[in-house]
């Protein structure tokens, strides 16, 4: 009887160890960025990502005064806050221009190495962008694609609803 119990315990231990190594470690499940920087290089010259998943920078430079973003890769929970996201040039300088909404976008596998040369994009629903350039999202994106969970190169952008990005999150941890 003791031999059977030990065998079952040993099998259960091996199964648990195998399952735990296949799952993301808790310190790798959560990614955060502590700041945002507005796009400096405009158009394709400032693109983030690869192939069909590349996101071009907006046609004019933008600035952001502060913000942060956090994502739990295992659950799909994401939160971002950005303040002072405004144009740094054009006749609309100091305002968000004609952009009443923005989306937050994860750019997964930025070098395209896992996706045949293409990055994978996952975006939030549109959220309001105030006249002062403030936007906030807190929600769940659902199950994230493998490129987001398994690849270490992930970027976070705040974009227009038409696709170009205004700001990139910087200082990624971990």
Go through each PLM region and give its residues:
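Bacterial N-terminal signal peptides that target proteins for export
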Residues: 1-9
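Bacterial N-terminal signal peptides
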Residues: 10-18
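N-terminal segment immediately downstream of the Sec signal-peptide cleavage site
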Residues: 25-68, 72, 173-174
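Short, surface-exposed binding/anchoring microloops in extracellular/periplasmic proteins
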Residues: 56-96
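Hydrophobic residues positioned within well-ordered beta-strands of beta-sheet architectures
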Residues: 67, 80, 102-104, 137-139
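Extended low-complexity, serine/threonine- and proline-enriched intrinsically disordered segments
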Residues: 93-113
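Helix-rich interaction surfaces within compact, conserved domain-sized segments
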Residues: 114-174
């Amino acid at each position: 009887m003791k031999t059977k119990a030990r065998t079952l315990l040993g099998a259960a231990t091996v199964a648990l160890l195998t399952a735990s190594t296949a799952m993301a470690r808790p310190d790798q499940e959560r990614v955060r960025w502590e700041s945002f920087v507005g796009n400096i290089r405009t158009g394709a010259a400032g693109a983030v990502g690869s192939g069909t998943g590349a996101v071009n920078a907006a046609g004019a430079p933008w600035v952001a005064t502060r913000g942060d973003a956090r994502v739990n890769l295992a659950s799909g929970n994401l939160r971002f806050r950005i303040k002072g996201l405004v144009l740094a040039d054009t006749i609309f300088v100091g305002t968000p221009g004609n952009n009443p909404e923005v989306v937050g976008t994860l750019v997964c596998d930025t070098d395209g190495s896992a996706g045949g040369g293409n990055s994978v994009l996952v975006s939030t629903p549109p959220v309001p962008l105030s006249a002062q350039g403030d936007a906030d999202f807190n929600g769940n994106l659902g199950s994230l694609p493998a490129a987001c969970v398994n690849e270490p190169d992930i970027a976070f952008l705040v974009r227009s609803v038409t696709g170009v990005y205004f700001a990139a999150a910087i200082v990624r941890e971990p």
